[in-house]
Amino acid sequence: MFWISLVCLSVSHKMIGMCYLLVAILCGFLGYIYSLFIRLELSIIGCGVLFGDYQYYNVLVTTHGLVMVFAFIMPVMMGGLVNYFVPVLSGFPDMVFPRLNNMSFWMFMGGFGALVSGLLTEEGMGIGWTMYPTLICVDFHSSLACDFTVFAVHLLGVSSILNSINLLGTLFCCRRKFFSFLNWTLFIWGSLITALLLIITLPVLAGGVTLVLCDRNFNTSFYDVVGGGDLLLFQHLFWFFGHPEVYIIIIPVFGLISTMVEVLGFRCVFSSVAMIYSMILIAILGFFVWAHHMFVVGMDVDTRAYFGSVTVLIGLPTCIKLFNWTYSFLYTDFIIAFEA
């Protein structure tokens, strides 16, 4: 009973971070098992390991994508490593809203439970991890599995938003006097930028999937062409979240690598200020390139030229980061010890 209360009711940032890491790693193993079934099915001609059940193959693809994105990668970085290390690196005793931190973890658990419920309900949700209409519309998937999936996305998104608000409150409200923003490690900067990305993009995704629920259950026609809706509206809303999601995943890793370089090399990364500005620039440009995921839908030439050009621009701040890391590696004596 003591251990159950310690885990379930704990408000310690370290305990919550470890719970996030443990659950997310288990979810990662589950997603990996799904990917093995997908590869086995593709490697066999004719009826494979799924015995010709094409719907269940689509369910596996959907669950694998959603689990890996929402239940593995994001919780490992923002829920696990950020929760555990940001207060330690900042000199704070804990996060500014400890109970909100605990609430975000249990909302994450509830979202994962809703996702598993969608997997096990009737024939499952064979809609793809992007959840495009018309596959998710009631005419093609009338079961409650799709509703469970949308509800899971809502819960997982709210969990990430609460976690991000907690992080922003911790960094800005608990900042010590005379402690400059430039004194933050690059991992803290990466976590801050990622939290802002989550707060901006997740409500857009939530709005898009809420309209899906309305189409399925309340006879609206936001994505029904016959009723005056637009199928591409959901794609724009989804990829406005989906492309910054790439940077939500990678920017904390940028900061983590920079911090590892500093620790192993016993010196600051070359041009830390440029590293901060490059992460900020990557995040800003990431909001203006979402439609390069939609080139096949028939956009005009000017639109494709714009999104393609801005996509190329993201390579510039990325090159700055790679140059600074390379320079730090070349002119630093790293100490890496391997124990027998």
Curated annotation (Swiss-Prot):
Q: How is the cofactor bound?
A: Binds 2 heme A groups non-covalently per subunit. Binds a copper B center.
Q: Which residue ranges run through the membrane?
A: 18-38, 42-62, 66-86, 100-120, 148-168, 186-206, 237-257, 279-299, 305-325
Does Protein biosynthesis count among this protein's keywords? Answer: no
Question: EC number(s) on record?
Answer: 7.1.1.9
Q: Name one Pfam family in it.
A: COX1
User: Could you say which residues bind Ca(2+) here?
Assistant: 41, 46
Per UniProt, the keywords (alphabetical) are: Calcium, Copper, Electron transport, Heme, Iron, Membrane, Metal-binding, Mitochondrion, Mitochondrion inner membrane, Respiratory chain, Translocase, Transmembrane, Transmembrane helix, Transport
Reactions performed catalytically: 4 Fe(II)-[cytochrome c] + O2 + 8 H(+)(in) = 4 Fe(III)-[cytochrome c] + 2 H2O + 4 H(+)(out)
The task this protein performs is described as: Component of the cytochrome c oxidase, the last enzyme in the mitochondrial electron transport chain which drives oxidative phosphorylation. The respiratory chain contains 3 multisubunit complexes succinate dehydrogenase (complex II, CII), ubiquinol-cytochrome c oxidoreductase (cytochrome b-c1 complex, complex III, CIII) and cytochrome c oxidase (complex IV, CIV), that cooperate to transfer electrons derived from NADH and succinate to molecular oxygen, creating an electrochemical gradient over the inner membrane that drives transmembrane transport and the ATP synthase.
Protein name (database record)? Cytochrome c oxidase subunit 1
**Organism, scientific name:** Strigomonas oncopelti
Q: Could you read off the lineage of the organism from its UniProt record? A: Eukaryota, Discoba, Euglenozoa, Kinetoplastea, Metakinetoplastina
> What gene name does this entry carry?
COI
